Amino acid sequence: MSMSTSTEVIAHHWAFAIFLIVAIGLCCLMLVGGWFLGGRARARHKNVPFESGIDSVGTARLRLSAKFYLVAMFFVIFDVEALYLFAWSTSIRESGWVGFVEAAIFIFVLLAGLVYLARIGALDWTPARSRRERMNPETNSIANRQR
């Protein structure tokens, strides 16, 4: 790299370098200031979690159903797709009929995915037993007669 090239790079990027240095320095200043100025808790309940004035009971290791993670993933997927549709809607005049057909296909694929998720039971929060009873009402009536 010659001297003129490095000088050109510095000339183009000096503002970003100063911004980066100031931002990192400000973060360090706030962390150090909080460490020096922050209060110290010396009570015996220092590490006990406090939640809405209620003492915690049991362990914090709760097992969550995978349904919560599935719903979160579905939300993110459909949220990103809504962003695509919003971007398309802002440029609908420029895209014309071709863009409209492409968006219609995109929406159809979204609806097909939603129907598929509903059919496999990914959006169903009921237990498997009640789902079976709904799917096969004859089994439900036979089970009730045997009781």
Curated annotation (Swiss-Prot):
Its main location: membrane. The chain crosses the membrane at residues 16-36, 68-88, 97-117. It is a multi-pass membrane protein. It catalyses: a quinone + NADH + 5 H(+)(in) = a quinol + NAD(+) + 4 H(+)(out). Its EC number is 7.1.1.-. One of its GO terms (cellular component) is plasma membrane. One of its GO terms (molecular function) is NADH:ubiquinone reductase (non-electrogenic) activity. Disulfide bonds: none annotated. Keywords: Cell inner membrane, Cell membrane, Membrane, NAD, Quinone, Translocase, Transmembrane, Transmembrane helix, Transport, Ubiquinone. InterPro entries: NAD(P)H_OxRDtase_bac/plastid (IPR023043), NADH_UbQ/plastoQ_OxRdtase_su3 (IPR000440), NDAH_ubi_oxred_su3_sf (IPR038430). Pfam families: Oxidored_q4. It is found in: Cell inner membrane. The keyword Transmembrane helix applies. Gene3D superfamilies: NADH:ubiquinone/plastoquinone oxidoreductase, chain 3. NDH-1 is composed of 13 different subunits. Subunits NuoA, H, J, K, L, M, N constitute the membrane sector of the complex. Belongs to the complex I subunit 3 family. NDH-1 shuttles electrons from NADH, via FMN and iron-sulfur (Fe-S) centers, to quinones in the respiratory chain. The immediate electron acceptor for the enzyme in this species is believed to be ubiquinone. Couples the redox reaction to proton translocation (for every two electrons transferred, four hydrogen ions are translocated across the cytoplasmic membrane), and thus conserves the redox energy in a proton gradient. This is NADH-quinone oxidoreductase subunit A. It comes from Salmonella arizonae (strain ATCC BAA-731 / CDC346-86 / RSK2980). The lineage of its organism: Bacteria, Pseudomonadati, Pseudomonadota, Gammaproteobacteria, Enterobacterales. The gene is nuoA.
